[in-house]
């Protein structure tokens, strides 16, 4: 029976270690933190253990079939044994690939909710208009996924948006939206263009995981909290109370603000979420400057030539330059139909992880 015996042996050892961890849970002297750590590891390893046991049963069945074929006294069973052997051979590559994927390290941020920030870059007014288009695209995408989108801060311009920050809560939010970080480029004829020339503009998108307070320590003494009257939509209430909150992290100079909530308490809570995300980003940027998801490596300067994706309106085309994927249905993508692009990016991420892990 042909299969990767070295790989099989390596996975078997990992499974044996997981089974030993399960036994360790019965030790009476474990601390709460040790139990928590073991359970976390077992939760991560459980899918691998289950898949490997299925694979091992198949290999055992194949070896048994080979033994029957080598025994001339069991010729009446040879036909069935051949069928069994062929069946197992046909699924071995599928199982080996599945096990490899289960061996990959899990990005714990994938399950987290996110904070998304959109800023106009090159292109003036057209960039602000495109920013509003992208915001609507993400709003529709989130609605289609059943995710909750909440605006933290929105600054309108005369023709579109100058800035928007929003949080998204749901299942596997960061796992999907993290690929949106970077420079998005649009090519189209602006409504104000009288000669029909195509203009190029860009918007930068940053996607940050929402972190719990225990994940990012913030000393209250390092904060300056200012309150002010909210502006914009919200009715008379926003003009009567100082519900808007601005928080400055003095050691880093990072400033966050929120005015979309109805109360100062709500806005402060949201602003603290934003601050934790920005401090996480700063720490990651300093320690792992090449890690995916960082604004410095993903967003860049916003220059027209520096982009992750292009939206070409005249050709109804969207091209993701990271994986050289072109989809000719911009008209539906800009309305929130992002699944095809995101699924392709996820597949490429897994491919790259496999190559790096087993190289």
Curated annotation (Swiss-Prot):
Location of N5-methylglutamine modifications: 236
UniProt organism field: Mycoplasma pneumoniae (strain ATCC 29342 / M129 / Subtype 1)
Pfam family, one: PCRF
Transit peptide among keywords: no
Record-linked SUPFAM superfamilies: Release factor
Presence of keyword Cytoplasm: yes
Swiss-Prot/TrEMBL keywords: Cytoplasm, Methylation, Protein biosynthesis
Predominant localisation class: cytoplasm
Domain of life the protein comes from: Bacteria
Family, as annotated: Belongs to the prokaryotic/mitochondrial release factor family.
PROSITE patterns per the UniProt record, alphabetical: RF_PROK_I
Protein's UniProt name: Peptide chain release factor 1
PTM: Methylated by PrmC. Methylation increases the termination efficiency of RF1.
GO cellular component: cytoplasm
Gene this protein is translated from: prfA
Cellular compartments annotated: Cytoplasm
Function: Peptide chain release factor 1 directs the termination of translation in response to the peptide chain termination codons UAG and UAA.
């Amino acid at each position: 029976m042909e299969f990767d015996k070295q790989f099989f042996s390596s996975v078997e050892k990992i499974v044996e270690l997981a089974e030993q961890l399960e036994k360790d849970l019965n030790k009476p002297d474990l601390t709460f933190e040790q139990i928590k750590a073991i359970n976390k590891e077992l939760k991560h390893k459980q899918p691998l253990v289950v898949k490997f046991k299925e694979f091992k049963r198949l290999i055992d069945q194949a070896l048994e079939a080979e033994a029957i074929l080598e025994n001339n006294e069991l010729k009446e069973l040879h036909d069935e044994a051949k069928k069994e052997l062929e069946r197992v051979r046909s699924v071995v590559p599928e199982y080996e690939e599945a096990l490899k994927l289960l061996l990959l390290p899990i990005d714990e941020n994938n399950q987290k909710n996110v904070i998304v920030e959109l800023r106009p870059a090159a292109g003036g007014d057209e960039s602000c208009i495109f920013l509003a288009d992208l915001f609507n695209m993400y709003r529709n995408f989130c609605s289609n996924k059943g995710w909750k989108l909440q605006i933290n801060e929105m600054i309108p311009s005369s023709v579109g948006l100058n800035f928007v920050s929003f949080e998204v809560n749901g299942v596997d939010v960061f796992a999907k939206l993290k690929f949106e970080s970077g420079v998005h480029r649009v090519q189209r004829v602006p409504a104000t263009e009288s000669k029909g020339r195509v203009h190029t503009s860009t918007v930068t998108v940053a996607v940050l995981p929402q972190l719990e307070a225990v994940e990012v320590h913030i000393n209250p003494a390092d904060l300056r909290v200012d309150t002010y009257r909210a502006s914009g939509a919200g009715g008379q209430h926003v003009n009567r109370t100082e519900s808007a909150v601005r928080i400055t992290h003095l050691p880093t100079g990072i400033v966050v603000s929120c005015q979309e909530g109805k109360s100062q308490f709500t806005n402060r809570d949201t602003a603290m979420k934003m601050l934790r995300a920005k401090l996480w980003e700063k720490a990651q940027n300093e320690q792992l400057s090449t890690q995916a998801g960082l604004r410095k490596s993903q967003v860049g300067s916003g220059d027209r030539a520096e982009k992750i994706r292009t939206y070409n309106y005249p050709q109804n085309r969207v091209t993701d330059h990271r994986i050289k994927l072109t989809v000719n249905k911009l008209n539906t993508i800009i309305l929130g139909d992002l699944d095809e692009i995101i699924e392709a990016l996820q597949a490429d991420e897994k491919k790259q992880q496999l190559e790096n892990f087993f190289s």
